[in-house]
Amino acid sequence: MMKKLWYNSPALEWKHGLLIGNGRLAGNIFGNGHGERLGLNHELLYSAKYADRECNPESLQYLPEIRRLLMNGNYLEGTKLANKVYGGAGGVAKAVKGPARIDPYKPAGELVIIPDVIENRDYYRSLDLDTTIATVHYDGVTYEYVADSVADKLYIHITGKLSARVGIEYMEDKQLHYLPTVSDDRFGAKGEYEGGVQFEVRVRVFTDGSFDGTHLTVEKEALLVVDIETGRDGAVAVSARLDSRETPVEERFCDLIAPHIEKYHSVMDRLVLDLEEEETEDIPTDQRIQTYRNGGTDLTLLKMYFDFGHYLLYSGTICATMPMNLQGKWNNLPAPPWSSDYHHNINLQMNYWPAEMMGMGEAHLTLFNYLEGIIPQAKKAAKTLYGCRGIYFSQTDDIWMRCTPESTGWDVWVGGAAWYAEHFFRHYEYTQDEAFLRDRAYPYMKEVCTFFEDYLIEDDRGVLQIVPSQSPENYFVRCMDEKEEIPVSLCVSSAMDISLVQEVMTNSIKAAQILGVDADRIPVWQSILDRLQPLGIGSDGRLLEWNEELEEGEPGHRHMSHLYGVYPGGFITAEGTPELFDACIKSYDARLSHGGGYTGWSRGWCANLDARFGRGDSAFEQVKEMIREFSSDSLMDLHPPKIFQIDGNFGGIAGILEMLVRANGEKVKLLPALPKELKNGSVRGIRLPGGGVCSLTWRDGKLYSGEITMGISGKVLLDGDVQLSGGTVSKHDGCTLVTAPVGTVITILGV
């Protein structure tokens, strides 16, 4: 099967281009029919104008009054006061000048190759997901683009006869000062942003023709080697780091990139999804997507969507030192939407939802490095803003890790750090790496628990409440004001925050018991769990999103925060908590009936929720809708108004995995939400908690065969009466338990 996105016309807009990357460097080939344009990015290129900011110590004095107002049901006044003193300018120290904002992620420019004559004859472009090579061909010249994950460079390989202008170009940006650089064998640019970040783009030229610094001729073959460096330590130091990475280029292009392709396959071949093939591969990808939008079917396109998301996870993380932001590592705008920031209330988390199941747990590590890097500032923020030990994350952040609450309303939320505790613990569950649990996951989780030990307050019934609290970015009618916009409603103990506290305390108790540490903390956390405000169900049978029945300001809101316990949390289940599970289904159905899921990432969340609800056809419809309405012609996820935002790509493929294997809690369910349209197929290499690996084949909508390679834990608990060969098998409570040494292959005979 051909694994290529391909087209017979140029990408007229950036969002329809072809993405390449290795985590540190990134590029987008979009051309627009007027020559070659490679949009360049470096993961650390920010202006630093807003890098040095502190939380406002005056905010804390208002916390008792905010709590009094909210506990008395005066949500509007409590929210107004909190917004004034905590969110935006109110939450940032008065000594800091300028508006409250996140530092924007900046493009490194556009590398242009403009042929002297352009006719666009025999135009063809493609992205090969099997080799990572993006190819553009027209007028007898072929351009091949690769982001090398071994040499950590970008390559442009040119074959054919060419005469062209080359250089680095920039959009207008008042924060940027730059100069072109040229010599007899290279070109590029040096720049500095007014915040003090310097950067350099360096392109080395190897050609069998000629090059004079701005004009390139090629007789048969040329190679451009691109590297980018950034820093706040001066242009000389930036250039020196580029110098240190320069190496001779003596191999043929195919030999040069061979180690990269080998490394790529060593990671990507861990998981392979196969679906029934359809005769659509000879049709350009944009035309196939349009047919899909018009109601056609194309399972091969669905597989392409899955493989592309898998490719993006590799391309955005493998050489990275920082996690992927809202646009991953790809941005062409000096002032990108939402500054290409890190959103801690769904978006950054969603970027890593599929990582563990896909066998790419190493992709998670840059996220953990980043989160651990925030801890010093997070401790200061917790103490300064809320008078608490432990850690507090603002709702948005950037690479400077400040934890300052920059957004009025949205940032008066204390759940961000707790959400990431689930990622730490999940990585342990899948890897069974006890050293990771001891040295990284548990210390982080304990900091979160410590914060809530101090933050929770007792009401007059002796119940522990989370105040102030919010359901991220959502609002209710009682907290609306005709005179001013109130973007988010604060409350007492939202369902989202209850779920986060419940989860982190429960998992921290498990972790402490596994490690045999902190015996004195376990009863403290258990006492909190026993006294914590429980999740509630309204008179209409829906899960209460806030602490009482409140009319929603936007019934079809894009966030599904109150359903966290179903996904990604997984502790609300049909078997264990049936009443809450049914209430979540009713809440979810009501939200969608009012137009919910109107962004790409929101649809991705819906796909996972539907899969957890066991509704495969509905989950599949969510993914199809993501392709139809929320994807560009090159399958980039789109957020209204049709701008690239990468989280949906990962939410979508996580949803596909959830249709095939459900592994929340201790039980594993095979094909829990298989859609009718996916009658036949197979998946090889889905990772399981405990370190195991599962492969499945299904025929006519039923499990046909499979195998499980046992992990470090030595056991897998399967939901249902599953017929197995190998290991020690026992049946109890409607489940099948298999135990065997690590590496043992268990054959699945059927259900």
In which residue ranges do the predicted regions lie?
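Non-catalytic carbohydrate-binding regions of carbohydrate-active enzymes
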Residues: 425-431, 436, 448-458, 521-553, ...
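Core alpha/beta catalytic barrel or barrel-like domain that forms the active/cofactor pocket
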Residues: 384-386, 413-426, 462, 467-470
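Acidic/histidine-rich catalytic neighborhood
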Residues: 447-511
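Alpha-helix capping and helix-loop boundary segments enriched in small/acidic/polar residues
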Residues: 338-342, 355, 404-415, 431-443, ...
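Well-ordered alpha-helical segments within folded domains of soluble proteins
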Residues: 345-356, 414-425, 496-506, 561-570, ...
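Acidic/His metal-coordination segments adjacent to aromatic residues that form catalytic metal sites
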Residues: 328-339, 393-412, 469-493, 629-641
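Aromatic-residue-lined binding/catalytic grooves and analogous aromatic/hydrophobic interfacial grooves
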Residues: 1-408, 424-428, 446-449, 506, ...
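Short, glycine/acidic-rich hinge or "gate" loops at secondary-structure transitions
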Residues: 320-329, 437-440, 457-467, 517-524, ...
